[in-house]
Amino acid sequence: MGLHFTLLLAALANCLCPARLCIICDPFVVAAIKTLEQNYLPTHLAPEHHEDVMKRVEQEVRNFADLPLNQNTFLGVVDEDTLEQASWSFLKDLKRITDSDVKGELFVKELFWMLRLQKDIFATLVARFQKEVYCPNQCGTMSQTLIWCNKCEKQMHFCRKSMDCGERQIEVHRLEDMVLDCQLSWHHASEGLTDYSFYRVWGNSSETLMSKGKEPYLTKTMVGPEDAGNYRCELDTVNAGPATIIYYHVTVLPPRSVEEKPPPNIVTQEEEETPVQVIVPTLEPEPEPEPIPTVTHRPEKKLKSRLLILLILGFVVLVASVIASVLHFRKTRVKSKNSNVENKTSAAEFKSEAESPQKMGSRKLSQAEFHTDSSDKVEEADN
């Protein structure tokens, strides 16, 4: 069983590459196939069916070579993003089979169905790569890092097309800003680009460098008649030769005319001489209504009025809260005074009650002394 499936893996490795099925270039796919051989197949497929299954799988794998090789479908190369998408789809379906724990004939059917499906998915991804990603430049030279499926190697590919990207007609009014744009849609995807250089081209074919840098724009403020003429932009690369060359023919137009209109509060002589006409509404369709003077409310005035109302309401609430606080304070103060008076009255009453027995005793003592004195005086008189 191990030998048969090893041969099957060899067939996969040998047949997928000539058929330019690039998923075999992904190390994760190779690891998944190895895991399938060592862990899944020994317990899910009977040994007597290995030879027949292997032949059928080899035939199915050879069918990957049916991909048409032409400029519009497949050239035997892909980019890294397309390879990742194809590998992810293959690994997802293979994991689905192993997670389902299918065995025997059902496993074989699932495996064949997965191989056919992955062939169609890979063909779709490659066709999209050929149409949208592979050499999208219409002019100039573009550099791309691509993967050659027959070798599983990354190499730099140069999409060489006409270096002349045409001439652009630029019209700008005097005293306005002139902007020359040298950026193309494929520049961000190209590799090995350096600086944008803008030149002024004179009549004797000589050139003057105006700017050089990473910015793809040349801006000239307040242009005049002397700025009219021919310009050239060149995008340099790390290799020999530019990636893009664009020419510009600049025409400086006269300044824009500004129509002067009288202010609305000044009445012209024509308006004074013209009698006021009263527009009478008619039954004709879409009559012109008589202009009615309306008071236009500016947003600033509305905002100021709203803020003023909010301030007034806030001030009223503040005054009301202050008045309520003062009344509450006075009320609590009166209550405290009343409680103090009551406390003092009760203390005075208690003191008077305490002093009353002492006063009674003193009164009795004074009366006794009075009687004693009076008796002594009577005795002295008798003597």
UniProtKB/Swiss-Prot annotation:
Q: Which GO terms describe its biological process?
A: binding of sperm to zona pellucida; fusion of sperm to egg plasma membrane involved in single fertilization; heterotypic cell-cell adhesion; single fertilization; sperm-egg recognition; syncytium formation by plasma membrane fusion
Q: Where is the composition biased (Basic and acidic residues)?
A: 370-383
PTM annotation, UniProt: N-glycosylated. Glycosylation is not essential for fusion and for proper protein trafficking in sperm. Phosphorylated. The cytoplasmic C-terminus is phosphorylated and undergoes phosphorylation changes during epididymal transit.
Tissues where this protein is expressed: Expressed in sperm (at protein level).
Q: Effect of gene disruption?
A: Males are infertile and spermatozoa show impaired adhesion to the oolemma.
Q: Name one GO molecular function term.
A: protein binding involved in heterotypic cell-cell adhesion
Which pairs are disulfide-linked? Answer: C22-C149, C25-C152, C135-C159, C139-C165, C182-C233
Query: Which is a Pfam family this sequence falls into?
Result: IZUMO
List the SUPFAM superfamilies hit by this protein, alphabetically. Immunoglobulin
Query: Which residue range or ranges hold the Ig-like C2-type domain?
Result: 167-251
Q: Where is this region: Important for interaction with IZUMO1R?
A: 148-160
Q: Which residues does the annotation flag as glycosylated?
A: N204
Q: What else is known?
A: Izumo is the name of a Japanese shrine to marriage.
Fill in the domain comment: The extracellular domain assumes a distinct boomerang shape when not bound to IZUMO1R/JUNO. Interaction with IZUMO1R/JUNO triggers a conformation change, so that the IZUMO1 extracellular domain assumes an upright conformation.
Purpose: Essential sperm cell-surface protein required for fertilization by acting as a ligand for IZUMO1R/JUNO receptor on egg. The IZUMO1:IZUMO1R/JUNO interaction is a necessary adhesion event between sperm and egg that is required for fertilization but is not sufficient for cell fusion. The ligand-receptor interaction probably does not act as a membrane 'fusogen'. Plays a critical role in sperm-oolemma binding prior to plasma membrane fusion. Can mediate cell-cell fusion in cultured mammalian cells independently of its binding to IZUMO1R/JUNO.
Q: What is this protein called?
A: Izumo sperm-egg fusion protein 1
Organism of this sequence: Rattus norvegicus (Rat)
Q: Gene behind this chain?
A: Izumo1
